[in-house]
């Protein structure tokens, strides 16, 4: 089938390169180190964020490969939670539960859990999540590492989240976790798996082929590429040399709103496919300052009028797609951006992002609200050991995205699986975030506050006001005079308090109490949601319910 050609082609390339470097790598190297990735979870990364921020040249493209951060992450985490030399206690509360190792191989495995009970005030319902799964990772020899995880879930969510999941836009897609099916009357049943094979071809090249997510930036959110959406197949090639790190990412996405059957397209079945080729070039300007350049192209695999099939031109590994796009008279969706990070002191750093979907410089200067001036920015600040209190971190962030950014006239928008590939709010929003995180020994506490303003579409109105990236931008409200929060202006104040006790740092297994207050006000609705829960969970993954 033609929609599989992209990854069949990439897998053939990967397998040839893999086996070539496999034998040459074993011949020239007798060192053993894991090429597995650090988890993307914000909570997990609070354990090591300060060390990574100050001692790693390149921290933007995530998940970070363990050996690329110049730190022994496992030792750092273990040292922070050591103190009991009892073998059984050490195994249960510090390390993976299953360990198989030899001179040139290592396999680790642990269960993944999220057993949660809660209560929500609007519907006056008891909420719960029942997650069971596993994680397995390891290495064979000095070049090959692997990772796989699987979780199966049943959940009843608080009212605001349940309502969003059931909207036609989301169509039963659980944020970041795939499509669910009905579980009894008001719950969802859903599952998620991920995995990859990692190969260190040399001191300069690392290849990863698998099914997962990525994140570009140093903040809580990303405007370039985030782990907000569901997993996807990918090929990642990371090149590191001197003051440069260059990453190629090729991915396949699905459009759940376009189901192609044998009746209307004889050689396609299932959901419509689209592909992304992305480049990220990071340069270390100094010991304190790092700058990154990002670009991506998304194109469709659909042989209808005005659409492209698989286009080998976008396998070009060299940065700057615009000349390629122009040379083939492309109607595809291109995004470019910058990310910056500056270490102010050994305890603090500034970071920023700038994203351009498309814009006209003359219209931008005239400030007349031209609809196609589609851009956004992020600016953030982190301060570690605030007030000289060890492990107290302050995190501030602002995000701003103009209407219609990331959207397109066809399904080559910047989305996957009914979700946004960048920010969960889509476009036409501003957001201010404050996070205070504190850890002492195994005690883990966090306070998070978000102030959000966005302009949404009106129910029953076919006009797009620029928030929903899946809406055709040709159905816009006007060409000029497009201001921020165009449409149904909505305000959200979201506060979340978490108090936890870490049982095992390897999987960030913790007992956690959570209290959430969400206040939404708009022209049509006013809701005050209060939700609390207690859980036993492996907190390795980001689940973005804070919008």
Predicted regions and their residues:
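Short, intrinsically disordered/low-complexity patches at protein termini
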Residues: 23-24, 169-171, 230-232, 241-243, ...
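Exposed, low-structure sequence patches enriched in small/polar residues
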Residues: 33, 190, 284-547
């Amino acid at each position: 089938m033609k929609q599989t050609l992209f990854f069949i082609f990439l897998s053939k390339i990967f397998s040839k390169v893999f086996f070539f470097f496999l034998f040459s790598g074993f011949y020239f190297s007798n060192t053993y180190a894991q090429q597995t990735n650090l988890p993307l979870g914000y909570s997990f990364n609070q354990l090591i964020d300060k060390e990574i921020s100050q001692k790693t040249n390149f921290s933007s493209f995530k998940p970070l490969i363990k050996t690329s951060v110049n730190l022994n992450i496992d030792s750092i985490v273990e040292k922070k939670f050591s103190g009991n030399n009892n073998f059984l206690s050490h195994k249960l509360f510090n390390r993976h539960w299953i360990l198989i190792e030899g001179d040139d191989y290592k396999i680790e495995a642990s269960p993944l859990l999220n057993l949660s009970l809660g209560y929500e005030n609007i519907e006056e319902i008891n909420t719960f999540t029942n997650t069971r799964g596993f994680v397995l990772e390891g290495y064979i020899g000095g070049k090959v590492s692997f990772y796989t995880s699987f979780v199966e879930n049943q959940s009843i969510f608080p009212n605001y989240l349940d309502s969003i999941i059931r909207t036609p836009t989301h169509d039963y897609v659980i944020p970041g976790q795939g499509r669910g099916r009905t579980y009894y009357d008001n719950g969802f049943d859903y599952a998620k798996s991920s995995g990859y094979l990692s190969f260190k071809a040399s001191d300069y090249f690392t290849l990863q082929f698998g099914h997962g997510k990525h994140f570009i930036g140093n903040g809580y959110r990303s405007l370039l590429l985030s782990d907000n959406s569901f997993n996807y197949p990918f090929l990642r090639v990371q090149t590191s040399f001197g003051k440069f790190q260059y990453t190629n990412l090729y991915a396949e996405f699905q459009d759940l709103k376009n189901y192609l059957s044998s009746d209307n397209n004889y050689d396609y079945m299932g959901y419509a496919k689209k592909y992304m080729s992305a480049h990220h070039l990071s340069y270390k300007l100094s010991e304190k300052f790092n700058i990154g350049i990002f670009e991506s192209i998304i194109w469709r695999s659909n042989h209808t009028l005005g659409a492209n099939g698989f286009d080998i031109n976008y396998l070009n590994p060299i940065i700057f797609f615009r000349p390629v796009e122009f040379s083939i008279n492309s109607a595809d969706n291109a995004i470019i951006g910058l990310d910056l990070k500056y270490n102010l002191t050994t305890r603090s750093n500034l970071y920023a992002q700038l994203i351009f979907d498309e814009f006209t410089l003359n219209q931008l200067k005239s400030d007349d609200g031209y609809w196609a001036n589609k851009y956004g920015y992020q600016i953030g600040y982190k301060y570690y050991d605030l007030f000289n209190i060890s492990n107290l971190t302050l995190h501030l962030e602002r995000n701003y995205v103009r209407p219609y950014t990331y959207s397109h006239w066809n399904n080559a928008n910047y989305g996957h699986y009914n979700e946004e590939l960048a920010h969960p709010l889509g476009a036409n929003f501003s957001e201010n975030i404050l996070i205070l995180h504190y850890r002492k020994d195994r005690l883990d506490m966090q306070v998070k506050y978000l102030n959000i303003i966005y302009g949404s579409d009106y129910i029953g109105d076919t006009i797009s006001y620029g928030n929903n990236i899946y809406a055709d931008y040709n159905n816009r409200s006007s060409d000029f005079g497009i201001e921020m929060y165009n449409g149904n202006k909505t305000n959200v104040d979201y506060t979340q308090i978490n108090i936890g006790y870490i049982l095992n740092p390897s999987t960030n297994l913790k007992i956690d109490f959570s209290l959430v207050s969400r206040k939404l006000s708009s022209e049509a609705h006013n809701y005050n949601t209060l939700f609390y829960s207690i859980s036993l969970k492996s907190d390795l993954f980001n689940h973005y319910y804070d919008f």
